[in-house]
Amino acid sequence: MSLRVSMRAFSLSSRVCARSGSKFSFGDLSKVKLRAPIIPTHKNFDVSPDHPLWAFFPEGNNTETALRSGDELDMNSREWTFAELRRKSFEDLHKLWYLTLKERNILAREVRLAESLRYSRTQQHDALDEKLVTVQKRIKQVLLERQVAHERVQTFTQQQQQYLTEFEERYLNASEHEIVSFNEKLVRLQYAFFGIEPQLQDYDLEDINIKFVEGLSFVANLKVKRYLKQNPAQEQEFELPLNGVVEELPFLLRNVTEAIEEVKALRQSGESVKLDKIDVFPFLRSALSNAIEQEELDQ
């Protein structure tokens, strides 16, 4: 339908032009100047030096040849070992993966170009690509190991938290003749779960980490809860929770009664402050160092 309409319109316009008597003619063609033909060549194209496709060439926009020979390839290189990759951070593995992928893309482009040129000497390109494939497989294996380890830690953390909850309940409900045994278990627990040494002189101040802080909080609050349960009258005078490591540390260094009095004194003097995270480790190292020195002097 539309095709026939357009043909009629064209036919009418032709008739109108013919009836008008207008004549169209070219001028003197001898005066028309023709430019010399432009021979197609890559020099006629201005390619940006930052063009993303330069990434498919080994030297970027400084690459002198589109296809390297086998002698130009680095065949003396070796694959990254598992031991080397396991020491790398996630960021380093990410970078290494994409550097390897980039080199494989460069080799793949050269091999495809060689095939189009019927050039068959690409065995060394393939051999180098196999090394890169091996590196990528090893990176994936290392990441898989980390994922499995993380999942196991998560499972262990859940089991650990369940055990701590059950231990806390048994500790708080222990009778007077049972509490001695539970205190011994608490010492073993704080070392096994949090790395808190039983003896003050055995502390390595450089080993103080987030697990140590978590263990300190668990032990201190557990002892306070037990004390307040045994001394209900103190509940109105002593509020929980403890205000960070400043109030928790005394329960690791002294018996519960002395620690309670020390925390009360800190609160009354206004010295009980919640430290910023960046100040927690330095405070603990300094306080424990002073406590160790004092213990050595007392001996």
Curated annotation (Swiss-Prot):
Gene3D superfamilies: 6.10.140.1190, 6.10.330.20. It is found in: Mitochondrion. One of its GO terms (molecular function) is structural constituent of ribosome. GO terms for biological process: mitochondrial translation. GO terms for cellular component: mitochondrial large ribosomal subunit. Disulfide bonds: none annotated. Keywords: Mitochondrion, Ribonucleoprotein, Ribosomal protein, Transit peptide. It comes from the Eukaryota. PANTHER family: LARGE RIBOSOMAL SUBUNIT PROTEIN UL29M, RIBOSOMAL PROTEIN L47, MITOCHONDRIAL-RELATED. Component of the mitochondrial large ribosomal subunit. Mature mitochondrial ribosomes consist of a small (37S) and a large (54S) subunit. The 37S subunit contains at least 33 different proteins and 1 molecule of RNA (15S). The 54S subunit contains at least 45 different proteins and 1 molecule of RNA (21S). Belongs to the universal ribosomal protein uL29 family. This is Large ribosomal subunit protein uL29m.
